[in-house]
Every structure is written in structure tokens, then in C-alpha cells.
Curated annotation (Swiss-Prot):
Cofactor(s) this protein requires: Mn(2+)
Cross-referenced CDD domains: DRE_TIM_IPMS
SUPFAM superfamilies according to UniProt: 2-isopropylmalate synthase LeuA, allosteric (dimerisation) domain, Aldolase
Name of the gene this protein is made from: leuA
Main localization (coarse): cytoplasm
Family assignment from sequence similarity: Belongs to the alpha-IPM synthase/homocitrate synthase family. LeuA type 1 subfamily.
Protein name: 2-isopropylmalate synthase
Residues in Pyruvate carboxyltransferase domain copies: 8-270
Lineage: Bacteria, Bacillati, Cyanobacteriota, Cyanophyceae, Oscillatoriophycideae
Catalytic activity: 3-methyl-2-oxobutanoate + acetyl-CoA + H2O = (2S)-2-isopropylmalate + CoA + H(+)
Amino acid sequence: MNTSPDRVIIFDTTLRDGEQSPGAALNVDEKLTIARALARLGVDVIEAGFPHASPGDFEAVQKIAGSVGSEADSPIICGLARATQKDIKSAADALRPAAKPRIHTFLATSDIHLQYKLKKTRQEVLEIVPEMVAYAKSFLNDVEFSPEDAGRSDPEFLYQVLERAIAAGATTVNIPDTVGYTTPSEFGALIRGIKENVPNIDQAIISVHGHDDLGLAVANFLEAVKNGARQLECTINGIGERAGNASLEELVMALHVRRSYFNPFLGRPAESTEPLTKINTKEIYRTSRLVSNLTGMIVQPNKAIVGANAFAHESGIHQDGVLKHKLTYEIMDAESIGLTNNQIVLGKLSGRNAFRSRLQELGFELSETELNNAFIQFKEMADRKKEITDRDLEAIVNDEIDTVPDHFRLELVQVSCGNNARPTATVTIRTPDGSELSDAAIGTGPVDALCKAIDRVVQIPNELISFSVREVTEGIDALGEVTIRLRYAGRTYSARAADTDIIVASARAYVSALNRLHVALQQKEKTPEMLQV
């Protein structure tokens, strides 16, 4: 095994660490959809979940291993496991269908974690790590070990732990900045120290994992690459615990745009034009939108690479410069991440073949049933909107691949409001038993009245904690996208919907979020979680 390749391995943990963002809970089908997108994107490793955490996570990892990871050229499918036999056995079982499976096991090494969380001594950790790595190795050849909170661990102790993990069979050692505490110079020095002081480090790939609590995760990772790290653990849109993880799109495009700078650190001539990762950058924007839609986590407009303003210029001086030559104020081409202004316009006279053809050109792969349903939505939208653009098509497709079970189905929405009127809303909803129930309510505004009317029918307790609207397209008949976040029993549930009518989009998003909550309540009754992580 080449433990110092001349390229960077991209390890995506959107489906594991990214899903730990409040409100980002995904069902099995949604995880499968994202895993397929990650494979298209070209990631080397997909960390599909934490199999022992819950039956749902086990099923998701197993299904991803059997579908996305079943071929010889598929990405490596990875499952997380604590350094216990039960966790490791669950991961091995879930990963069995994968052609290239990996177990990722971890144990904390910082004194604060040892004292307050694990209540173990350093000597105990030095004994547990090789034992559990060897146990994982008894199932699979590919084993990754992480010393949790390495960024705050004593370096000398860390060197000992890593040496024992590698001796026991770890093929990758991952160095996590678990709480986003280190600075780039410190993190680079930590990686350099590991390269210089772990005797058998040449037998494993050095990986890094980091959180963005101080906004330094990407900078830390790039410094780590310069000092010998060859695997980067990251997420789409940087989602994850607290302030999130290092952002995949920012890391990949930094390595892409500044290739001549990073080439020598990977043993290449500065002028080499070979990509530093296997990522198909033209899939970045579409993957970002998919993850945002399915998790309900909005990408901030000024987010690097994939934000709505990333390639926008408002200053007259900047606009003039860009019109004369793009490189005056743009360091990368929007088309390099799959964002194009080449908007093919469809209308109400466009047929199924034109619709199918444009979806294929945009890279969407739909089943015949999904295509039929999406075409019906397209025709309905075309009757209300003069022109249908690529952004509209994207919204239609994302609605169709939103796999939340339709237990409660919105059949009718009517709202009355005005400057001298009490906002009222009437709704009709089909319930899980097939009956149609109608009710009405008044509120402080049309959306408030709408949510109250829906609550009277559905009767699922919740707290609406976030409501946002953004335009998908331009013009007076623009498609509007509503994102709603609910909270119940300490957990957050998100959903989104798009429509030319914001009230209709609001109703659909709210019902979709309630469906997510309803499914979660049903699953909790049937199969309580195996452990709390």
C-alpha cells in the first residue's frame, strides 16, 4: 500500500458526522440518494454511518454497502465504531455487502476526555487501542483508527497510541481536531511531529478530521496536507456538529485552484496539471443543492464556492472588470463546479421527451415512476409560469426525490388575508387511515393561520423554530422555496418545498416536516435506539 500518494484522498462523512447537525436527520432512502451522489462526485471513501448507534443507521450502512459500494470500482464504504467489540462487530456485519469495506474505530486520548468521559488511565488506553484495532482487523483488512480529541492530546502520548494502532493493523490513522481548537500552524506541526516521531508511520496513511468552531478547519487541513496528511475527512456544505466540519467543496477547490502551490508538497512538479483529487468538480454544485434540500439546511448566500453570491458582483468596478475579463475578480469559473447560466427554457408546450432529455443533460437519474410524477409537476407549473428554467427543473426533481413518507397528505389550502382582515386558513388533509379531514384557523398572519389549521387536523405536538423563504428563480412569477424546522423532545426536524405560491409551499413544507416527526415517533415506539451517541 502506498502510504504517501501524490494525491489527496477525499473521505466524506456527510452521512455520519454531517447528519449530527441539529435538524439534519435523514431516513434510509435519503441517505442512499446522497450516497449515490457522492459516488458520482468521485469521493474515495463514504462514511455511511454508525451501525451500532441504531437499527436505522445499521440498515443505512448495509444498503449503501450493497448498492453504492458493491462494485470493484465503487468508493470505499466505511462504518464508524467505538473501540468496543459490540460496535466493531456491528460495523463489520453492516459492511459485509461492500466490495471495499472499512471499519473506522476510535478512542479518546486527551486528558480531559480520559478523566471526565472515559474515566480511564493512559495505560488502559495503550492496552485497549491495539486490542480493538486487531479485533477490527480480524474482520477486514482496511481499518482506520482515530485518537479522539487528538488536537488537545499530549503529543508524546499520542505518538505511542498511534504506533500501537499501526502495529496492530491500522492502515489509516486519523488525527481529529474534535473541538476545532487548533490553529493552522499548530495543526501542521502536530502532523509533522507524527511523521517524525511515530516509528512505523510509513505503514499507514495520515488522515485529518476537524471541526470549524473557530472557522479554521479548512485552513488547518491545507496546512496538514503540506506536512504529510493524505486523507481529508470532510462534509458537503461543511455541515456537522456545532459549527460544522471542514467543507469538502472548499478543500477540493482550494487544491484545484492553487494546484501549482500544493504540487511540490505532494512530490509533483509545480507545473503539473494533474488533479490533486479524484473529485469531478462539475458535480459539486448539484451535490451541494441535494444535501441542502434533503437535510433542510440552507447554504448561506456568502458561503465560499456554493453560496448564491459566490460568483455574484454588485460593485460597478467589479462588474466592469469581470465583463472585460473574468479573471479580474474571479479566481475560478462557475462552470467548474457545475454552475451554468446556460438556461434552456421549457414551456407548457414542451413534451415528455424534451423534459426527459433536459433532466439527463442536467445529470439527473430518475426512475420511470419518478419521471412521470416529475413531469406532472412540470406541466402544472408550466400552466402557472411562462417559462421553466433549469433552476425550476432542479426544484421539481428535488421535490420528487424527497423520500419522506406521505402519511399526511395536503389536499387543499385556502387562505384569506388583508390589511383590514383577520388572516384565516382552511386546509383539507388526507390522514394515514385514508380519510379526509378539514379544519380552519385564524392567526397573526397567513402562515401562522395555516400552521394552526394543519395542527388542528394532524395533532402532532411540536414547536416551529424556523421559517425561511428564498427565491429559486427570478421574475414576478419566480419559484419560492420554503424551509421549515420543527422541534420536539429535544430533536429538530426539517423539510422544504417549492412552489410559485409561497402559501402552498409553506403548507407543503410544514406537512412534510410533520411527516418526518410522525415517522420518528413511530420508529421510537417500534425500535428504541440501541444507544445514545
